[in-house]
């Protein structure tokens, strides 16, 4: 913890998470609110869902490409938790990232609140259960949506892989879009506790809000269990894990890596 706390690069990474999450939430939720303005009679629910899904996915892909080399571009507490459980970041870094992400989401939603104040019934993209969807069903949707996202993050940023020739940010962005295509009609699609938290704070409405923390965190943890222990198990002992969690020395953790300098993942410096 102390080694990271004293590094300028660490705090630069925290600021990057704050700024990138602010931009992500502003762009994505702004696009979701935009369809409420009357622009024509040719809109359908399907068109709206695709538009919003693409906005969320493309904004993640763009920002991941922009700040991935600085902070790793988590922009999502569930992703941060997944990488923590995968022993790729320290506990202190995870905590500071989640705080930065939540504050960024609140700032973005507050700005949107001022810009869209003329909208009637403006919920600022707050996540909630759709009519006919109970809490168990909503929780399940959030778990599955986040599981596939964190699984994609772990797989596309795995330093041991030598077969990746595409873009990790694009793949992750498409995974976010896929999650939204699945979950929008059920929960409004959270799969990102910070994004859900910002809207809940500004609207002062925390109805069913627990689902959008518990679901993504369970999904993220399950993704780590599936990838790190079933699909692509790592050879590591408790000493290695504790070392990463306390000192954040990621480069010394992966004992399976043949060439530590040829990793493909987006890692902070």
UniProtKB/Swiss-Prot annotation:
What is the reported tissue distribution? Detected in erythrocytes (at protein level). Expressed in a number of tissues including erythrocytes, renal tubules, retinal pigment epithelium, heart, lung, skeletal muscle, kidney and pancreas. Weakly expressed in brain, placenta and liver.
Record field: transmembrane: 12-29, 47-65, 91-109, 134-153, 164-181, 207-224
Q: Which GO terms describe its molecular function?
A: ammonium channel activity; carbon dioxide transmembrane transporter activity; ephrin receptor binding; glycerol transmembrane transporter activity; hydrogen peroxide channel activity; identical protein binding; intracellularly cGMP-activated cation channel activity; nitric oxide transmembrane transporter activity
Describe how its activity is regulated.
Answer: The water channel activity is inhibited by P-choloromercuribenzene sulphonate and diethylpyrocarbonate(DPPC). The glycerol channel activity is inhibited by P-choloromercuribenzene sulphonate, diethylpyrocarbonate(DPPC), phloretin and Cu(2+). Inhibited by mercury.
Q: Which residues lie within the membrane without crossing it?
A: 69-82, 187-199
What ranges are annotated Extracellular (topological domains)? 30-46, 110-133, 182-186, 200-206
Q: Which CDD domains match?
A: MIP
What is the residue range of the motif NPA 1?
76-78
- Membrane side Cytoplasmic: which residues? 2-11, 66-68, 83-90, 154-163, 225-269
The record's Gene Ontology biological-process terms are:
ammonium transmembrane transport; camera-type eye morphogenesis; carbon dioxide transmembrane transport; carbon dioxide transport; cell volume homeostasis; cellular homeostasis; cellular hyperosmotic response; cellular response to cAMP
According to Swiss-Prot or TrEMBL, what is its membrane topology?
Multi-pass membrane protein
Query: Where are the residues marked Hg(2+)-sensitive residue as a site?
Result: 189
Record InterPro entries: Aquaporin-like, Aquaporin_1, Aquaporin_transptr, MIP, MIP_CS
Enumerate the UniProt keywords alphabetically. Answer: Blood group antigen, Cell membrane, Glycoprotein, Membrane, Phosphoprotein, Repeat, Transmembrane, Transmembrane helix, Transport
Family of this protein: Belongs to the MIP/aquaporin (TC 1.A.8) family.
Q: What role does it play?
A: Forms a water channel that facilitates the transport of water across cell membranes, playing a crucial role in water homeostasis in various tissues. Could also be permeable to small solutes including hydrogen peroxide, glycerol and gases such as amonnia (NH3), nitric oxide (NO) and carbon dioxide (CO2). Recruited to the ankyrin-1 complex, a multiprotein complex of the erythrocyte membrane, it could be part of a CO2 metabolon, linking facilitated diffusion of CO2 across the membrane, anion exchange of Cl(-)/HCO3(-) and interconversion of dissolved CO2 and carbonic acid in the cytosol.
Domain comment as written in the entry: Aquaporins contain two tandem repeats each containing three membrane-spanning domains and a pore-forming loop with the signature motif Asn-Pro-Ala (NPA).
What is the designated name of this protein?
Answer: Aquaporin-1
Show the taxonomic lineage: Eukaryota, Metazoa, Chordata, Craniata, Vertebrata
Q: Which gene encodes it?
A: AQP1
């Amino acid at each position: 913890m102390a080694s990271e706390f004293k590094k300028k690069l660490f705090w630069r990474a925290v600021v990057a998470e704050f700024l990138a999450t602010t931009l992500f939430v502003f762009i994505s939720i702004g696009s979701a609110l935009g369809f409420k303005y009357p622009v024509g009679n040719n809109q359908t629910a399907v068109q709206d869902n695709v538009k919003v899904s693409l906005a969320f996915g493309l904004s993640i892909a763009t920002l991941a490409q922009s700040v991935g080399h600085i902070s790793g571009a988590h922009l999502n507490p569930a992703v941060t938790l997944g990488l923590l459980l995968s022993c790729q970041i320290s506990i202190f870094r995870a905590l500071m990232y989640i705080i930065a992400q939540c504050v960024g989401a609140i700032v973005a939603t507050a700005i949107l609140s001022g810009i869209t104040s003329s909208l009637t019934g403006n919920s600022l993209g707050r996540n909630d259960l759709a009519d006919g969807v109970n809490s168990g069903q909503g929780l399940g949707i959030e778990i599955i949506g986040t599981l596939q996202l964190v699984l994609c993050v772990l797989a596309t940023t795995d330093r041991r892989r030598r077969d990746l020739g595409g873009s990790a940010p694009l793949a992750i962005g498409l995974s976010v879009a896929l999650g939204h295509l699945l979950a929008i009609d059920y929960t409004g699609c959270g799969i990102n506790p910070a994004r859900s938290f910002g809207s809940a704070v500004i609207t002062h409405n925390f109805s069913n809000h627990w689902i959008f923390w518990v679901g993504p965190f369970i999904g993220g943890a399950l993704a780590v269990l599936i990838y790190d222990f079933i699909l692509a198990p790592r050879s590591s002992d408790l000493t290695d894990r504790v070392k990463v969690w306390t000192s954040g020395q990621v480069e010394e953790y992966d004992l399976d890596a043949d060439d530590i300098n040829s990793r493909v993942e987006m890692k902070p410096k």
